[in-house]
Amino acid sequence: MISDNARSGMQQAPARSLFNALGFTAEEMKKPMIGIVSSYNEIVPGHMNIDKIVNAVKLGVAEAGGVPVVFPAIAVCDGIAMGHVGMKYSLVTRDLIADSTECMAIAHQFDGLVMVPNCDKNVPGLLMAAARLNLPTVFVSGGPMLAGHVKGKKRSLSSMFEAVGSYAAGTMTEEDVLEFEEKVCPTCGSCSGMYTANSMNCLTEALGMGLRGNGTIPAVYSERIKLAKHAGMAVMDMVNKGITARDIITKDSIMNALTVDMALGCSTNSMLHLPAIAHEIGFDFDIKFANPISEKTPNLCHLAPAGPTYMEDLNEAGGVYAVMKELADIGLLNTDCLTVSGKTIGECIATAYNRDPEVIRTVDNAYSKTGGLAVLSGNLAPDGSVVKRSAVVPEMLVHEGPARVFDSEEDAIAAIKGGKIVEGDVVVIRYEGPKGGPGMREMLNPTSAIAGMGLGSSVALITDGRFSGASRGASIGHVSPEAAVGGPIALVEEGDIISIDIPGLKLELKVSDEELAARKAKWQPREPKVTTGYLKRYASLVTSGNRGAILKSSADE
């Protein structure tokens, strides 16, 4: 066992004295030691139940003959961090989580790990760590929140943000906003739509790193406690069989996850996280891989914010495996990929079926023949940009309009709420990329303000920042190269005409090459927005959005 390095032989007698201090028995020191990475805290609604999930995992590990040992991982609530300086500290935690988990796992020589994440950066950070460490590893998330109910309709956090925009437009009263505030988030769990957290938990299941139901069983269901116990048992089975994370996280399983992403209509943030996970196994994942996958993958689900259904509905309809069964039946998945259950994807989904074609549409009745995401390129985004095509209204799939240019999120919000943005405009928010932000803030407040003010079907937003999974509309993010490194988005001037062609996968600035070259010759880098602390270090190491905003391993890279 790996843990023998820390516990066996006369040389490790001092370490054993410390295990004795922890209360380990002599019998426990002979059993596999399983690290349980707990993301529990009291500031993230999606993590406030994780202590209960962790306790269930511990029971499962012990039942199967292992010794469970809990250690922590940090987690940020993107909703609470939204709209202020705190959002600069969200994406950056992904790599902190991966790095700190690596340190804990290797320092203490665990034989296996159970990751218990739930929210946005916590899930991909731990997936990166799992791929890097290559230990027997199982994921079990905290689970999604139930939808709220306002005036007889299901609602979620995205409708809360849009309510603020409606209030600014004068179409909603303060009392109406208060009712949303009190009712849209009724339980613990990751916010109830197909936002980033739930997207990544579903893709964890598609990758094979979580058991059936990992992405969809609601946080408050007792079924999730059972799932956690089974996760503890499953990691012991992996230890006994010698199955490790890289047996499961492979190029093929990542492409499976990308295919499921397209069918589910996941958050655009998956186009940051899948490349980062792939990087950990040495797979150079180009975000432009998304387009050929999207071209042949039907979009089967329109969960909030794209439609009126929620994670609890997807769970009742058969969950991720039911979606995967639809895709496998038309040959779009590699069903030979291994899962943490010890079975292949094909074996796992063999008994899955679609219980509600209104929630999971059949291939014959798909929302569209193409997938939920698209990568657009052109002279405004030579290295690509990402849009959630499934959340764009038909009239905005092709659009041309004048640029309204802002060098920060705050300036853009002030203009939108001040009535300075009109139908046809293309809002450009730049210097918000991984390096320029720094931290690549989510532009949920601007997109929600646009939607709430009734401009969602006539105004587009383009940024080198990113979007919450709760954003909808013609919201094009991850524009690469970013403004801070002199990308073309830095050269856009007020009134320039921008052409968006989502079906054609094009994002163009209607300015001549000669004019762009002249502007580039005059361009000067901005002074860093942050000159101290972790963000300074992050800005010096982070790569572009099209590379997953991974960190360089050296200054020369």
Swiss-Prot record:
Active-site residues, as the UniProt record annotates them: S468
Q: Which UniProt keywords apply?
A: 2Fe-2S, Amino-acid biosynthesis, Branched-chain amino acid biosynthesis, Iron, Iron-sulfur, Lyase, Magnesium, Metal-binding
Q: Name one GO molecular function term.
A: dihydroxy-acid dehydratase activity
* Broadest EC class assigned to this enzyme: lyase
One cellular-component annotation, GO: cytosol
InterPro entries the record matches: Dihydro-acid_dehy_C (IPR042096), DihydroxyA_deHydtase (IPR004404), DiOHA_6PGluconate_deHydtase_CS (IPR020558), ILV_EDD_C (IPR056740), ILV_EDD_N (IPR000581), IlvD/EDD_N (IPR037237)
Q: How is the cofactor bound?
A: Binds 1 [2Fe-2S] cluster per subunit. This cluster acts as a Lewis acid cofactor.
**In the record, which positions carry N6-carboxylysine?**
K121
Cofactor(s) recorded in Swiss-Prot or TrEMBL: [2Fe-2S] cluster; Mg(2+)
Q: Which residues bind [2Fe-2S] cluster?
A: C119, C191
Under Pfam families, the record lists: ILV_EDD_C, ILVD_EDD_N
Biological process, per Gene Ontology: isoleucine biosynthetic process; L-valine biosynthetic process
- EC annotation? 4.2.1.9
* Function, as annotated: Functions in the biosynthesis of branched-chain amino acids. Catalyzes the dehydration of (2R,3R)-2,3-dihydroxy-3-methylpentanoate (2,3-dihydroxy-3-methylvalerate) into 2-oxo-3-methylpentanoate (2-oxo-3-methylvalerate) and of (2R)-2,3-dihydroxy-3-methylbutanoate (2,3-dihydroxyisovalerate) into 2-oxo-3-methylbutanoate (2-oxoisovalerate), the penultimate precursor to L-isoleucine and L-valine, respectively.
Self-association or partners: how does it assemble?
Homodimer.
Q: Which family does it belong to?
A: Belongs to the IlvD/Edd family.
Q: What is this protein called?
A: Dihydroxy-acid dehydratase
Which organism encodes this protein?
Lachnospira eligens (strain ATCC 27750 / DSM 3376 / VPI C15-48 / C15-B4)
**Species lineage:** Bacteria, Bacillati, Bacillota, Clostridia, Lachnospirales
- Gene (name only): ilvD
